[in-house]
Regions:
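C-terminal outer-membrane beta-barrel translocator/porin domains of Gram-negative envelope proteins
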Residues: 286, 292, 305-307, 319-329, ...
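Flexible glycine-/small-residue-rich
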Residues: 76-78, 88, 188, 249-253, ...
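Acidic/histidine-enriched alpha-helical segments
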Residues: 148-150, 219-237, 430-433, 474-477, ...
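Gram-negative/organellar outer-membrane beta-barrel architecture
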Residues: 275-280, 292-467, 532-538, 547-550, ...
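A generic beta-sheet turn/junction motif
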Residues: 80, 253, 299-301, 505-509, ...
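ATP phosphate-binding glycine-rich loop and adjacent ATP-lid/helix-beta elements
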Residues: 604-606
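Patatin-like phospholipase
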Residues: 1-282, 286-293, 298, 313-314
Length: 638
């Protein structure tokens, strides 16, 4: 997790979790004042910073690195001047974080107004820094990798690795030339291992151990029995965390300090709760306002202040995401959608945002919403919206459309709500739509339908899944209720309620999802635009996508999948899954008459891959109604 910027999904704010619910890819383009802005590194180093802060929290009282149990120096490089920067004092986690910010891989770290990167560019083997500390002998471990041949340069990481090696060879050789017979040089045989060889960590450790065992003169560096070797950081850790007397924020982001403080749950007057603080750091970073969120404990006159640093994003906080989803049954029936969303963050100190979505294809949509928190804790909010959409609604007989309509609707609404921690949300809304349905398939003399809709609505949501595509733990639930009300302008009065519950379980590489889904229209009114669309993989498999539509439905579902070793099946090392689903349920229009499938079973065999553009599934679906279908689907399925 240290080599990732993403917090645990369960730690991020609920609103940001919902960004996963569409088919847009996670990678995004960033804009600053309307201009495309590229990142300063592949990673911001957020999780790396939190790990260092947590491991070294007990050193916060030490400002002079000579006072550490083992005197220490960190070396970084000023990326603006190329000068070496030697840290002999300051905040230890920040110094270490700057000293390992490999250019291109990690974004530079700002310290005292200077942008710093890994010291590899200026002093890769800082022997002179060690001698300046007054040591008698130095032990040098040279892990410089040999240059790769052209045939071995097969990825962007290989190119970055080779570039770093070329840039550092000169300063490394200059430093190694100062070694004397009293010093010890270890050069482990690392072969082709480089900075990106994370999977080879154990082999690198073993190579270092062999290098030490084979070295001459090691005994000269062994302290005599009873000698003080200087101690170590682990033995200096306190038995309990410091009591926190105050919490302060050093904030350079777009939102008010109170917004950040509202996400920190550390009680005043109690010991530092490190696990909870790490979760809070993930929540703050997950708002997307900051490039780095760190903390330190400031000790002054017997008082301990938790100081949280939040650095605003230098590259901007407005994001564009693109995406594609498609379904194909290999029988000539396919659906596709291409979409984009643009989110403008931090419109005011409370953290307002403006979200716009555009989608073209089988289902078209233009949606824009202004989301305004009403308090610094970001609990209550108001969200007016404008919506225009178009979709196909088919009348199905034996899995074939006999009449197809193209439905278009446009309208606006207002939602009032409350977020429930990071796991859920409650929304109450009013909305008003106008629309029409035109014949797309079938008798062209069939009449078109114009309609008016107006709703009161209530939604209660919960989402604690660890992954939205292939979850291994957590649950999701949604209760939706809406009342079509003629007093607001609707053509008919009816109530509709839908409950969706899905629970994920994990055991080793295996995952199991247990789900129950119910939709009910509490009226005999036949309103086509209010029907539930079902059919397709996981939603009554064997039927084509959206091949079932009804005013009511019940569905129980069990999904199993197993994650397999990626290298067995693809060269991109993408997560690969094999699994199956079992489904049982019913779709109908009325209890006493009209369309009714009766209760029937369905199931599917599937294989899936978590690709860079979303989950990709191939499968075979069958059901007791006598239908079967092959399918390929790019986009969320279960």
């Amino acid at each position: 997790d240290a080599l990732s910027d993403s917090p645990q999904r369960e730690d991020i704010p609920y609103r940001r979790k919902q960004d996963d619910r569409d088919f847009l890819v996670k990678q995004r383009l960033t804009f600053n004042n309307g201009v495309l802005s590229l990142p300063l590194g592949l990673l911001q180093g957020q999780n790396m910073g939190v790990v260092l802060e947590s491991l070294l929290v007990h050193t916060n009282e030490i400002d002079n690195f000579d006072r550490l149990p083992i005197p220490f120096r960190a070396v970084a490089t000023d990326i603006a001047t190329g000068e070496a920067v030697v840290f002999d004092h300051g905040h230890l986690p920040l110094a270490i974080r700057a000293s390992l910010a490999l250019p291109g891989f990690f974004a530079p770290v700002e310290v005292d107004g200077r942008l710093l990167v890994d010291g590899v560019l200026s002093k890769n083997v800082p022997i002179d820094v060690a001698r300046a500390m007054g040591v008698d002998r130095v032990i040098v471990v040279d892990i410089g990798t040999p240059l790769k041949s052209a045939s071995e340069l097969t990825s962007v990481l290989d190119i970055m690795d080779q570039t770093t090696t070329l840039l550092t060879r000169t300063n490394t050789e200059k430093q190694l030339a100062t070694l004397t017979d009293r010093d010890l040089l270890l050069q482990p045989a690392l072969g082709n291992m480089g900075f990106s060889s994370f999977a080879d960590a154990q082999q690198a450790i073993d190579a270092g151990a062999r290098s030490l065992a084979e070295a001459n003169g090691v005994l000269a560096f062994v302290a005599p029995d009873g000698a003080d070797s200087g101690g170590n950081l682990a033995s200096s850790r306190p038995q309990r965390q410091a009591i926190i007397h105050a919490i302060e924020v050093d904030n350079s982001g777009k939102v008010a300090d109170e917004v950040v403080l509202g996400m920190i749950r550390q009680p005043i007057g109690e010991p530092l709760n490190l696990a909870r603080l790490q979760t809070d750091m993930g929540t703050i970073y997950g708002t997307d306002y900051f490039s780095r969120v760190t903390y330190e404990i400031v000790h002054d006159q017997g008082r301990n202040t938790l100081l949280v640093h939040t650095a605003g994003r230098r590259t901007g906080t407005d994001y564009l995401r693109l995406g594609l989803n498609l379904v194909d049954d290999f029988e000539g029936d396919s659906q596709y959608n291409v979409g984009a969303s643009f989110r403008v963050n931090g419109l005011n100190p409370l953290g307002a945002e403006w979200l716009t979505r555009l989608q073209v294809g089988s289902e078209q949509e233009l949606y824009t919403e202004f989301y305004q928190p009403l308090d610094y804790g970001s609990r209550y909010f108001v969200a007016p919206f404008i919506d225009a959409e178009a979709r196909n609604i088919d009348v199905i007989d034996d899995d074939d459309p006999i009449v197809g309509y193209r439905q278009k609707r446009y309208g606006a609404g207002l939602n009032l709500g409350r977020q429930i921690a990071n796991s859920g949300e409650v929304r109450f809304g009013l909305s008003r739509y106008r629309g029409n349905s035109r014949v797309r398939i079938g008798d062209p003399d069939l009449p078109s339908i114009d309609f008016n809709e107006a709703f009161y609505s209530l939604e209660i949501d919960r989402d604690t899944l660890d992954d939205v595509n292939f979850p291994h733990s957590g649950e999701e639930a949604r209760l939706s209720w809406r009342q079509s009300e003629p007093d607001l302008g609707a053509d008919a009065r009816y109530q509709q309620i839908e409950l969706r519950v899905n629970k994920a379980f994990g055991f080793g590489p295996n995952s199991l999802q247990l789900g129950g889904f119910i939709g009910r229209t509490d009226s005999d009114v036949d309103v086509a635009q209010s029907s539930f669309s079902l059919g397709g993989p996981g939603w009554f498999s064997g039927f084509r996508q959206d091949g079932l539509a009804g005013q009511n439905y019940q569905l129980g579902r069990l999904v199993y999948y197993r994650r397999l070793a990626p290298s067995y099946f693809n060269t991109l090392s993408l997560p690969f899954y094999l699994g199956a689903s079992l489904e049982y349920g019913r779709v109908y229009n009325r209890d006493d008459a009209g369309f009714d499938t009766g209760y029937f079973g369905a199931g599917s065999l599937l294989m899936g891959m978590d690709t860079l553009v979303g989950p990709l599934f191939f499968g075979l679906g069958v059901n007791e109604e006598g239908h079967e279908a092959l399918y390929m689907k790019l986009g969320q399925t279960f």
